């Protein structure tokens, strides 16, 4: 029977606040248990019923995502998604957030974010091969934001570098909405090394439950509940809820677990991440439709005075829970100990569908697995039928409201000064959100494992060579996997539906720009409180947009993460929500990495082309130009025509495979002028561009965003072959897709003309200086 000692005597109302539970939750818990929970059990329900663990606010929305496809082997529900990437190889991938921990303890918060996502990958039987990250901070004119940036980057680089997994790419954006609540999203990829995918469901009644890895301490207690609440001026008091990681133990854990998985003697595996031992045991039992009994006296402890509550809610890092074959138990224990890891039998699989926890010869918790993991409560929200009035008003904005252009100069509404287009381009390149992130990339080891094809920043997507024992396939070539993380949160703020469609489209476009076929996505939905009408409408609209884009582009969702309550309160209780940020992690495949291309120009006199959609809009509404130069965040983001998007990307990939295209780069933040500048900077070559549009404003031509546009260069020697191919393929496009030549690669300058009128004349070294030094100059 359950222990009814002093553990059961506690202030219910105060404890509910601590566990972030409501009175209705408490009544439901009592109903499910048939009695009042003791304090330990209440803590277990607190973490398992948090948004972080059970998606109680978002689950109905996530159910609409497309999750199946010809390449999908494992979708949502397991530790990570798995897809078939050909050549008898399987890719495991997922994205997770560590936002709140990074806000109060940036180094450890970010470091353990890396460690946690790596465990999700190797728990499936895959060797981690790459990490990407998507980061958001407040503007760098505040010392507190600079400190957060330093700490987060240092934490990511420390853990990734020490554990030997390359950090190969990502994105970083800056906006005041993130000042009190930075976002740290980490995506990891792994290559399956076992014949069978290792799943989490417990198997075979009587099988030993083996605890493997680091010791359990008091760090991270209640971390899942902390991650599911808003940040305020007292959040620094929650530092104990932030875990402390050890990448060297993680490295040993990776190698030891992969060795053990290969034997087939591990029946199931679950990492101890959010909610620690509570979540791992409950999910393992529920996924196997069985139960688990745990004896806390057998858990390796860092301290002697730990309570059952602390054992169960600790999120100490580098720990795994395994169900193993009893006859192989001693062999496995010795194998793990050889790696310097703790390996203790702490329980067994039972037929009764309960999680039963004992300590000091007493049962301290006894809960049905369905109550903890399967039948978790869902918060029902009303979704407003129309966009908020303030957005409808912003959507009415048109470019006619901007100052007139006179003598190729325009008045900035930000500082009331007139600037030439050349000066505006330099300003945009110095915007930290657009500028080079080399200050960050230099701190990451991107080359460890020797499979990184492009250095971070050199191409639109990261590209990893897939190889086993250095053997090429029968065609004497290596296949590869491309990955990109993307989200324009300004677009999502102004239109969550269109902005989320654009995030999926851009991530696919970036993968296509290196020559890879987009296959599937993982997503990280970073939003503010779902308890406000606007907050939940943003989340719902974003999910609708992601679903539509994924269906159209045939890139199913294999899993991901939801991070809500990303907002901060100041001393006056004023709430600042983050810009809604649904980060899309796209993966794709390429048959031969030798055919992949990067973003910079390759040869003088190569022809510069652009492909895009006539049906999709391109506009300076919602653009970086409008925000950074005019201090305006307004207008409706351009619409993406998804069928045209598919045509554009397909044509590009086919042209790359035929070796017609030498470089490619998508047109995104900053528009055409910034995209051209980036290609020049990456290659140390110039470009001569002739624009012909007659009826558009010059700033629209230079800085508009959207339109599914991709900039690419064609090798002069391949131009006729390319033209012949274009003639054949253009029959598939219809009237909605255009492909046109706009210039050629030159030596030292970026020259942009419009009907013989010079809009821009800048030396490449000027562009490079602004682009490369913007972030480092903030320190």
Curated annotation (Swiss-Prot):
The positions annotated for binding ATP are 55, 94, 523, 560
Which reaction is the catalytic activity of this chain? N(2)-formyl-N(1)-(5-phospho-beta-D-ribosyl)glycinamide + L-glutamine + ATP + H2O = 2-formamido-N(1)-(5-O-phospho-beta-D-ribosyl)acetamidine + L-glutamate + ADP + phosphate + H(+)
EC no.?
6.3.5.3
Chief localization: cytoplasm
Role of this protein: Part of the phosphoribosylformylglycinamidine synthase complex involved in the purines biosynthetic pathway. Catalyzes the ATP-dependent conversion of formylglycinamide ribonucleotide (FGAR) and glutamine to yield formylglycinamidine ribonucleotide (FGAM) and glutamate. The FGAM synthase complex is composed of three subunits. PurQ produces an ammonia molecule by converting glutamine to glutamate. PurL transfers the ammonia molecule to FGAR to form FGAM in an ATP-dependent manner.
Hey, which pathway is this one from?
Purine metabolism; IMP biosynthesis via de novo pathway; 5-amino-1-(5-phospho-D-ribosyl)imidazole from N(2)-formyl-N(1)-(5-phospho-D-ribosyl)glycinamide: step 1/2
Taxonomy of the source species? Bacteria, Bacillati, Cyanobacteriota, Cyanophyceae, Synechococcales
Gene that encodes the chain: purL
Pfam families recorded: AIRS (PF00586), AIRS_C (PF02769), FGAR-AT_linker (PF18072)
- Which residues of the sequence carry a binding annotation for Mg(2+) 2? 120, 271
Which keywords label this protein? ATP-binding, Cytoplasm, Ligase, Magnesium, Metal-binding, Nucleotide-binding, Purine biosynthesis
Gene3D superfamilies, per database record: PurM-like C-terminal domain, PurM-like, N-terminal domain
Name listed for the protein in its UniProt record: Phosphoribosylformylglycinamidine synthase subunit PurL
Q: Which GO terms describe its molecular function?
A: ATP binding; magnesium ion binding; phosphoribosylformylglycinamidine synthase activity
Q: Which residues form the active site?
A: 52, 98 (proton acceptor)
Quaternary structure per UniProt?
A: Monomer. Part of the FGAM synthase complex composed of 1 PurL, 1 PurQ and 2 PurS subunits.
Which cell locations does it reside in?
Answer: Cytoplasm
